[in-house]
């Protein structure tokens, strides 16, 4: 969807264009589970996704955390956001949030990422 200030938001299937198929296959498509058009990843994979986004010089606008309980996905209402266009600072904020969340809460969570790519 075209957004604001010449930016493009990447959600759900748009990740196909920037992520390796193996990483996409490990993602959890939330539209199937809870009707949210995002892909969630466990900790190790979401860190890989962040590095790919950084390499593409895309800005992480924020993300959400969901708890995994067997096949059930539970909304935690935990999230982070970033305002600005510095892709390095956005990467650092997302990485710090996710790493801290993982250290404090364990491995039964997935993380979604909302990304904006300023047109060049």
List each language-model region with its residue ranges:
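Conserved NAD+-utilizing ADP-ribose enzyme module
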Residues: 17-18, 35, 39-48, 52-63, ...
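Long, contiguous N-terminal structural blocks used for assembly/anchoring
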Residues: 1-40
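Surface-exposed beta-strand edges and flanking loops
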Residues: 13, 32, 62-67, 77-79, ...
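Acidic, proline/glycine-rich low-complexity IDRs
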Residues: 98-120
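Alpha-helix boundary/N-cap detector
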Residues: 10, 14, 37-44, 48, ...
């Amino acid at each position: 969807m075209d957004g604001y200030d010449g930016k493009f938001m990447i959600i759900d299937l748009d990740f196909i264009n920037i992520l390796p198929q193996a990483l996409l296959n490990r993602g959890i498509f939330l539209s199937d589970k809870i009707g949210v058009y995002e892909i969630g990843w466990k900790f190790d994979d979401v860190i890989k996704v962040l590095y790919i986004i950084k390499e593409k010089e895309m800005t992480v606008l924020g993300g959400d955390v969901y708890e995994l309980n067997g096949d059930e996905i539970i909304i935690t209402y935990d999230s982070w956001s970033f305002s600005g266009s510095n892709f390095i600072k956005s990467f650092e904020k997302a990485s710090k949030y996710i790493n801290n969340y993982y250290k404090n809460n364990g491995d039964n969570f997935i993380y979604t990422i909302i990304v904006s790519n300023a047109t060049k």
